[in-house]
Amino acid sequence: MENIEKLLMQEKILMLELDLVRAKISLARANGSSQQGDLSLHRETPVKEEAVHSALATFTPTQVKAIPEQTAPGKESTNPLMASILPKDMNSVQTENRLVKPLDFLRPHQGIPIPQKSEPNSSVTLHRVESGIQHPHTNYYVVYNGPHAGIYDDWGCTKAATNGVPGVAHKKFATITEARAAADAYTTNQQTGRLNFIPKGEAQLKPKSFAKALISPPKQKAHWLTLGTKKPSSDPAPKEISFDPEITMDDFLYLYDLARKFDGEDDGTIFTTDNEKISLFNFRKNANPQMVREAYTAGLIKTIYPSNNLQEIKYLPKKVKDAVKRFRTNCIKNTEKDIFLKIRSTIPVWTIQGLLHKPRQVIEIGVSKKIVPTESKAMESKIQIEDLTELAVKSGEQFIQSLLRLNDKKKIFVNMVEHDTLVYSKNIKDTVSEDQRAIETFQQRVISGNLLGFHCPAICHFIMKTVEKEGGAYKCHHCEKGKAIVKDASTDRGTTDKDGPPPTRSIVEKEDVPTTSSKQVD
């Protein structure tokens, strides 16, 4: 019995120690730091020892309950199913901060409120937070040459400034100091102006004409504002013209020199037809649509061979483009066949005030066979500004010839006719009266001495000779006073070049008021 009493006493002591350990663990969790828990354990060790000694001092054998007699040997331990081990029969434990009850151990978080996260108030914690922040690294890009040369801090702006521009050079640097040093070294070597720094928000990269830089126009985003309707399967068509349609004399001279010096090595989508004084562009599939538009405005195109999606002519005037689409869908059975646009055009004329005459075009649409491009040769370009009028007169004569040849064709379908443009195609049937009247009206409007925007006696003389061969008559009241000058000029020309235009420098008169002309063709 004495051994049993000792064992029971040791059991109670161990239970007290266990309760103390649990209470201290709970207190350590409440403080939120294991270090503080260790310090609390160290500080409360005398309390624990005092509680143990007091329990031993007050213990007497009479307080021990006798264990009921067991029915079998080895069953002297307490029955685990007895209510004495339930939490309600266990004693409360006093700690430094609060009275911990055994029932608390069965509650969520052991009856201890979850401590709130405190703000970092130490330099160590602040340093730990700042060390986790990653500052983005900014690269700098130097565009050395081209229309948008400068120093950029954004790759998107740099790409827009260099994309599609031939011969442009650019490089990336890690710091603005390195970028500035490289830019200054380049400008000093090239003896050009100092490159400016262009931040992201101040970059203004607007598309320029092909004559200045080959930059494609930006794609236009579609904005759908209607609610409750189905979005169309395709985006809206781009604007008809994405740049200024009026061509300047400098742009014309640039395109003229480009056609004369083109040798066919740099671009497989272009070949040229070279004559004595002028070279005309021929555009194949995948040609640059903006260059097609500018060459069209300059009157320097002979033929266009567009793709099935007609992307090469998407910047031409809308009515011309629509006429080509109607021909493709309504006039040929196999819409997948390749087509061509054969263009006969005048060239622009300028005065001191600016553009005087825009080109006029006669366009033939047809089904294209196998393309056999002519060999492009680099021709010598010696044109001067004073020679542009003579070149315009020559193009005007060829334009009139092409327009009058329509009278010999009996099977023509007029696809579109405008003030300065006629689009036609061949037809399997004879020309109907409506189309014939449209052709005659267009001829009467444009075939005159004022074809180029001013009265040109050389054009009148050419028209008169051409109409007389057809058995008709042509009269111009502007030429009545200058018949002798025209005859003398034509006589001088016969000794040199019978087919070329007469000299025009001394006989060109600017038209102030539109003139009336008559044309009779038998």
UniProtKB/Swiss-Prot annotation:
Residues 487-500 have a biased composition (Basic and acidic residues). GO terms for biological process: regulation of translation. GO terms for cellular component: host cell cytoplasm. Keywords: Host cytoplasm, Translation regulation. InterPro entries: Ribosomal_bL9/RNase_H1_N, RNase_H1_N, RNase_H1_N_sf. Belongs to the caulimoviridae viroplasmin family. Enhances the ribosomal termination-reinitiation event leading to the translation of major open reading frames on the polycistronic viral RNAs. This is Transactivator/viroplasmin protein. The lineage of its organism: Viruses, Riboviria, Pararnavirae, Artverviricota, Revtraviricetes.
